[in-house]
């Protein structure tokens, strides 16, 4: 469970920046595709 929290917390922190959030969303979308 700790590893899941460690990966999710940084994502929420990055989400504070719209531009960076969009890049992360694009990376996640391309990775899942």
UniProtKB/Swiss-Prot annotation:
Alphabetical UniProt keywords: Hydroxylation, Thioether bond, Toxin
Cross-link (Cyclopeptide (Ile-Pro)): 11-18
Propeptide positions: 1-10, 19-33
Residue positions where 4-hydroxyproline is found in the record: 18
Gene: AMA
Name the UniProt record assigns to this protein: Alpha-amanitin proprotein
Entry annotated with the keyword Acyltransferase: no
Family affiliation: Belongs to the MSDIN fungal toxin family.
Other noteworthy facts: The typical symptoms of amatoxin poisoning are gastro-intestinal distress beginning 6-12 hours after ingestion, a remission phase lasting 12-24 hours, and progressive loss of liver function culminating in death within 3-5 days. One of the few effective treatments is liver transplantation.
InterPro entries: Amanitin/phalloidin
Annotated positions of the (3R,4S)-4-hydroxyisoleucine modification: 11
A Pfam family hit: Amanitin
Molecular-function GO terms, alphabetical: toxin activity
Chain positions with (3R,4R)-4,5-dihydroxyisoleucine modification: 11
Protein's job: Major toxin belonging to the bicyclic octapeptides amatoxins that acts by binding non-competitively to RNA polymerase II and greatly slowing the elongation of transcripts from target promoters.
2'-cysteinyl-6'-hydroxytryptophan sulfoxide (Trp-Cys) cross-link site: 12-16
PTM characteristics: Processed by the macrocyclase-peptidase enzyme POPB to yield a toxic cyclic decapeptide. POPB first removes 10 residues from the N-terminus. Conformational trapping of the remaining peptide forces the enzyme to release this intermediate rather than proceed to macrocyclization. The enzyme rebinds the remaining peptide in a different conformation and catalyzes macrocyclization of the N-terminal 8 residues.
Species for this entry: Amanita rimosa
């Amino acid at each position: 469970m700790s590893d899941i929290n460690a990966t999710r917390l940084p994502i929420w922190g990055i989400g504070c920046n719209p531009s960076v959030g969009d890049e992360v969303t694009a990376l996640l979308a391309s990775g899942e595709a």
